[in-house]
Amino acid sequence: QADVIHLHWINQGMLSLNDIRKILTSGKPVVWTMHDMWPCTGICHYARECNNYQQECHDCPYIYKGGGRKDLSYRTFRKKQKLYSYAPIHFVTCSHWLKEQAQTSALFEGKSVTNIPNAINTNLFKPMNKKEARAKFMLPEGKKLVLFGSLKITDKRKGVDYLIGACKLLAEK
C-alpha cells in the first residue's frame, strides 16, 4: 500500500483526468512533478507567448483554425479546476522558470509549488582534463568544438538561433 502517490508526465493517454480524479480521491497525499506546463494550463505543454492560463484558458491561439470561447483549452481548464479541488496536490517543478510560470496560473491559486532541480550524478558528470577528454572521444586537439543537441531543431526554445550565431562568429575568426 502506497504512502504517497507521485505523478510525473502523465500525458499521451497514460492517465486521463478521470484517472487523476480517482487518485486524488484515494485519500493518499499526491505529489506531481511537472516536466512541462500542461498541469497549469488548459492544454499547452508550453504556452509560448499566451498568458490566458493566468486567468482562464479560452480562444486558444494554438488550436488549428483558432479556438473559441468554449474551445478544448477552456473545457480542459475547467475540468482541471474542478479536479484540483478534490484534494491537495503538492506540485514540484524541475526549474525556477517553470515554478514561476506555475505560480501565475489561475489553476494553481493556493497550491503548493516547490522547485527541485533534476539531480546530476557529479561522480559521473564532472570536469576532466581537456587533453584526456579529446583523446577519449577522438576529438581533434587545438580546434574549437561546438556541441548542440535537440529533438526538434525547428523549436526556437532549443536555441538553434544561438548555434547559428555561434557558428557565424567562429567562421569569422
Which residue ranges define each predicted feature?
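A short helix/loop element that forms part of the nucleotide-sugar donor recognition site in Leloir-type
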Residues: 126-139
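Membrane-proximal helix-turn-helix segments that form the acceptor-binding/catalytic region
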Residues: 21-25, 38, 50-91, 106-115
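Generic beta-sheet signal
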Residues: 33-34, 94, 116
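Short N-terminal targeting/anchoring amphipathic segment
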Residues: 2-15, 29-35
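Short aromatic-enriched loop/helix-cap "lid" or pocket-rim segments at secondary-structure transitions
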Residues: 19, 42-47, 52, 105, ...
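Carbohydrate-associated surface elements
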Residues: 97, 119
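Conserved donor-binding/catalytic core segment of Leloir-type glycosyltransferases
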Residues: 140-158, 164-168
